[in-house]
């Protein structure tokens, strides 16, 4: 059996990280891979498309019900879904109460101690990436996830989050084996999105693994709590996810130590691509509008 690959999908909230990861993992099953998903997002939506159900019970919720994590059995928290994919959600506290990253730490320790990582080819962590705090960075910090894939788009905040995540990876890369596997761009149909994604990947000393085109069939599948791979296996979008899965599968050992950029460099890049207008351009447009308004009858 090949060595266990521990990968993680990071990305800002709402970027489509969980949807992308579940579709990719469903496609990896078709390549004969055995997979465990560890959801590390407080929304606990990392496995619903694989399980074809509402969010599963989380480790923290079930531990609270039973008394403590020590009172749990592996079967209490681990469910099996599409293609035999094993699913666990770490969960988190109520909003405004405690550290959401605590669930990540508790879950990973529990799963390792109870043999959940045995007999799988991939462990995939689905992690919130708006902030890379100690808890959410746990898969990186503890040298669990060794290949990080950042899901992003051509939108400003998605680019900012991707750069921030790269900074978090860099912090732990020198002391461990964690590497940036690459960027995955979820198309939002912004200006020059593909060019921008490739440019950011290059600046981060990485590569754009795949550009996932926008397609409404993804939403149709999600409404039915299914991946596109399951819902419409012969669709063009399913083929895109299979292509992405193949790229990740062949990317073992090809990760890099990222070179994050400053906020000023990120803004300069947006200016270079004509995405963000300079102060001079904004003033010119404002003056033109004022002149137009003054001469209007």
UniProtKB/Swiss-Prot annotation:
The reversible ADP-ribosylation of Arg-102 inactivates the nitrogenase reductase and regulates nitrogenase activity. [4Fe-4S] cluster binds at residues 99, 133. The keyword Cytoplasm does not apply. ATP binds at residues 11-18. PROSITE patterns: NIFH_FRXC_1, NIFH_FRXC_2, NIFH_FRXC_3. The keyword Translocase does not apply. The modification ADP-ribosylarginine is found at residue 102. Binds 1 [4Fe-4S] cluster per dimer. Its cofactor is [4Fe-4S] cluster. Pfam families: Fer4_NifH. One of its GO terms (molecular function) is metal ion binding. It catalyses: N2 + 8 reduced [2Fe-2S]-[ferredoxin] + 16 ATP + 16 H2O = H2 + 8 oxidized [2Fe-2S]-[ferredoxin] + 2 NH4(+) + 16 ADP + 16 phosphate + 6 H(+). Keywords: 4Fe-4S, ADP-ribosylation, ATP-binding, Iron, Iron-sulfur, Metal-binding, Nitrogen fixation, Nucleotide-binding, Oxidoreductase. One of its GO terms (biological process) is nitrogen fixation. Its EC number is 1.18.6.1. PANTHER family: LIGHT-INDEPENDENT PROTOCHLOROPHYLLIDE REDUCTASE IRON-SULFUR ATP-BINDING PROTEIN. The key enzymatic reactions in nitrogen fixation are catalyzed by the nitrogenase complex, which has 2 components: the iron protein and the molybdenum-iron protein. Belongs to the NifH/BchL/ChlL family. Homodimer. This is Nitrogenase iron protein.
